[in-house]
Amino acid sequence: MASLDLPKSPNVFHPEKPSAVGSRNSLAQDCRDQQQEVNQLIEEETNKILHHLNTKLPKEVLERLDVMGGLKEKLYNYFNQNYQNMFNRYMVTAEDEMLKKVRGFIDREEMKVLNRYTPKEIAILLDEVAGADKFNTGEIEKSMVNMYGHLQGHIQRGVNELETHTNSLLRQKVDVGAFVRGENAYAVVKCAFKDNLARPKTVTDVKLSINILDSELVSPIFHYQTTVAYLIKDLISNHYIDAIDKEIDRVKDELIDQGKEEMSDSSIIFEKMKMVSDFTDDDCENPDSKRYELISRELMERISNLRAEIDPETFDQLNVRENIKKIVDLENIRNRGFNTAINSITSILDTSRMGYQYIENFKNARELILREYDDTDISNLPDERYQLRLKYLDNAQLIEERKGYEVMLRSFETEVDHLWDVLRTKYDKSKASRFMAKITDFDDLAKVYKKHIKKHYKDKTGEPVYEDIAKVWDEIAFVKPAETEVERMNRTFVYEKDKMRRKLILMRGKLKGMYDYQYPIERRVMEERLAFLESEFNRFDYLVNPFHLQPGLLLDIDITSIKRKKATLDGMANVLNEFLHGISKGFADAAFASFSRRRSTVRADIGQSFASDGSADQKESSGRVAFMDMVNETPALESSVAAEQVDVRSDVGMKTRKAGAVDAGKGRRGRRSAIREL
């Protein structure tokens, strides 16, 4: 529909008409006494100038000036004729122009509504032809929204790829930062780059593990075996938290309306804790307890120990238990969290041109295994490939995972120590079989000189012999410090792994030193065992330590990529960031959000000050105070300060010359300080 441009207001210039340009009267000043405001402003400015004259001019000059009579009237008239008119006309014009802008905006919005207006005759005609179900643009609008959404997704994905390539070019290498961006870096549990065993010069293997906590998931994930009572209690708990948040918002609004100070983050947390008892309590046996206000104790007892599946022999569609379970199942609370995660990762892989040939979804175990190729034989796979494992772990599973991990580590320690003992026994026997060579290593040499050292050195000084001193260091790893509760609850096993790795290296070196170029059966057997332990230990060390995980979603990815090509690495980087953005809420540090100023900018030396003059207190100041005066000195006033300090040096004498670093204003040191100040 065509629109007509109507005049919004007359563009009139007049000194007295309200709403005119340049007028001293405004429509916005309907309830204000303009003359009283002007008189108050002029009176204040006149008194300021008179007070300034009274303080600056001598008394005889003030007596000659008629301050109380003619001068005040002249000042008053000057302000009244100039300052008042300029200031008042500017304010009036600004207010009127703002009204015109608002009025024009309202008119434009009204024209938009008129353009969409449909005459009554056309609406009746459409109803007679078909009806609203036929002439409905809802589906077309949904299609347009989907089209724009896909377009925006492709644009964003292209921008992410460009950003990833740019970062890799700037780095000139591939590192952990190429995968996960800064806002998601906290979710990384382990990321390791290592050369491929078959082609170490051209191919790299990457291990990446990401842990998304329960509290960070957009849609919570529950195990398939979770009871219906647990799901309902979780819903009730979320309802209580929402109610507490609304109550806190209401309290905030009341404080703002009353003009009081807003609550701090700590105060909000304490208030939330106080409100918990208003919604629930710990009395499980009382049917009238607050915890049973939303759902009665009788219903909770009916659904106790009710899980995802019901025994067909006891199933009845009309029972209360079955209907409550049906309501929960219709909302799909049990499965929607994990299903959303699977849909997200698979759709992102499809749109990112990262296809896959093998997928296995363990629905009841909440685990997804996805591989780019179905074959698992490394010798038949290309150098560009990936596989990922998506699994949800609760606290009970993590406890068992940690137990198994620790048992496996102790088993490795037992096997490595056993091979160490066998190799050491063989080494000692090989030394005993050498009749001609009495000295093979440092221990043999120490035995030869043992009596001589005891007789000539230790007995004279009274010190104990080396063999009588308790040997704490095993010469393999440094002494391990005592464990605290933190180490016992969070086993890293870094010390044990480093010690085993060190033992494997020492055993290989000792085998080479014992046999050189000889390969008897003993050497071959021990080298085979050593190679097996090394390969298995590397596989074990490549896994994620469950002591570092927390209950939530675990994304474990293994990538093999060509070093020069890096196609899979770049593609998986975009997939990971988009996946984390879709299912994780992330976290925001409230301390940093409320911290409005950096500490480095809050310093006493930010407010620069000039060097002080030569007063009596300045004479006895220390050298540190004089140095701070030199630092705070400005080059613009360097000459004037130096001129004033000439008299100070003449009065103080030699003592002031020694302590006053500021006094060297005209020398070379003063010029250097001026350069530093600039």
Curated annotation (Swiss-Prot):
Residues 667-678 have a biased composition (Basic residues). It comes from the Bacteria. Keywords: Coiled coil, Cytoplasm. Residues 24-49, 290-311, 397-417, 522-540 form a coiled coil. Component of the cytoplasmic filaments that run the length of the organism just underneath the cytoplasmic membrane. Its main location: cytoplasm. Residues 1-24, 656-678 are annotated as: Disordered. The keyword Coiled coil applies. It is found in: Cytoplasm. One of its GO terms (cellular component) is cytoplasm. This is Cytoplasmic filament protein A.
